[in-house]
């Protein structure tokens, strides 16, 4: 007996299968194209910014240094140091007396330091390359002489004083020599004593005057001698 199988639908001759990859069904959450991160930009100080800050600090320190040296200062002078070697500058510092200070600073910074002070009279020197000499002594000629000696020995004729400020007054290059020839306090008092000892001196009659008047007169006489020496 033959048996026959009847189907409601004929069997397909070819069975198609569809293969789905795991990644298409379950996307990888760690795959870059499926995960977006916000971009974070970190700003760091640039070299230019750091350099500018350091430069500004140094400028402020220079101004403060100049102002400090101006305390108890009797004379501020500018010297043209163009062409100076490092060794020459070091030797010059050693040659100067202890009551003087020599520094190199930009004209603009020195000008800022002397602003609204009696030293503002030095402003005509604010050009060229200057080294600044601070004299912390009333004996101006004695303080300046070592530089003149150094200048002559090293044949630095071009490195002369470009100006100076003394008692709020500016002295140009040709007038600085007047400061170099001022009499010292010892010389002034010697002249004063000589005048007092002179029988015909008008000061002899003032010895009986009150002490306050005598002191005032002595100061006026000293000032007169200084002015005469400068004019001479």
UniProtKB/Swiss-Prot annotation:
Residue interval of the organelle targeting sequence: 1-52
InterPro entries: Ribosomal_uL10 (IPR001790), Ribosomal_uL10-like_sf (IPR043141), Ribosomal_uL10_bac (IPR022973), Ribosomal_uL10_bac_type (IPR047865)
Pfam families: Ribosomal_L10 (PF00466)
Keyword Transport: no
Domain of life: Eukaryota
Ribosomal protein among keywords: yes
GO cellular component terms listed in the entry, alphabetical order: chloroplast; large ribosomal subunit
Gene Ontology MF terms: rRNA binding; structural constituent of ribosome
Single GO biological process annotation from the record: translation
Keywords assigned: Chloroplast, Plastid, Ribonucleoprotein, Ribosomal protein, RNA-binding, rRNA-binding, Transit peptide
Compartments in which it is found: Plastid, Chloroplast
Subunit organization: Component of the chloroplast large ribosomal subunit (LSU). Mature 70S chloroplast ribosomes of higher plants consist of a small (30S) and a large (50S) subunit. The 30S small subunit contains 1 molecule of ribosomal RNA (16S rRNA) and 24 different proteins. The 50S large subunit contains 3 rRNA molecules (23S, 5S and 4.5S rRNA) and 33 different proteins.
Function: Component of the chloroplast ribosome (chloro-ribosome), a dedicated translation machinery responsible for the synthesis of chloroplast genome-encoded proteins, including proteins of the transcription and translation machinery and components of the photosynthetic apparatus.
NCBIfam families per UniProt: PRK00099.1-1
Family, as annotated: Belongs to the universal ribosomal protein uL10 family.
Something else known: Three forms, which differ in pI and possibly also in C-terminal length, are produced, L10 alpha, L10 beta and L10 gamma.
Protein name: Large ribosomal subunit protein uL10c
Organism the protein comes from: Spinacia oleracea
Gene: RPL10
């Amino acid at each position: 007996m033959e048996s026959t199988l009847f189907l409601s639908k004929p069997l397909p001759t070819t069975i198609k299968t569809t293969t789905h990859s795991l990644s298409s069904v379950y996307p990888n959450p760690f795959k870059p194209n499926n995960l977006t991160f916000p971009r974070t930009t970190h700003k760091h100080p640039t070299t230019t910014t750091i350099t500018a800050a350091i430069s500004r600090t140094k400028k402020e320190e220079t101004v403060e240094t100049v102002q400090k040296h101006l305390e108890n200062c009797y004379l501020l002078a500018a010297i043209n140091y163009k062409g100076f070697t490092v060794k020459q500058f070091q030797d010059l510092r050693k040659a100067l007396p202890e009551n003087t200070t020599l520094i190199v600073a930009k004209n603009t910074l020195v000008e800022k330091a002397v602003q609204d002070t009696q030293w503002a009279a030095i402003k005509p020197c604010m050009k060229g390359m200057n080294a600044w000499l601070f004299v912390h002594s009333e004996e101006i000629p004695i303080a300046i002489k070592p530089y003149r000696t150094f200048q002559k020995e090293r044949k630095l004729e071009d490195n002369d004083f470009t100006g100076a400020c003394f008692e709020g007054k500016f002295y140009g290059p040709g007038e600085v020599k007047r400061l170099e020839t001022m009499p010292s306090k010892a010389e002034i008092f010697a002249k004063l004593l000589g005048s007092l000892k002179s029988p015909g001196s008008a000061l002899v009659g003032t010895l009986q005057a009150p002490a306050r008047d005598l002191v005032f007169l002595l100061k006026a006489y000293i000032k007169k001698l200084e002015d005469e020496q400068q004019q001479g």
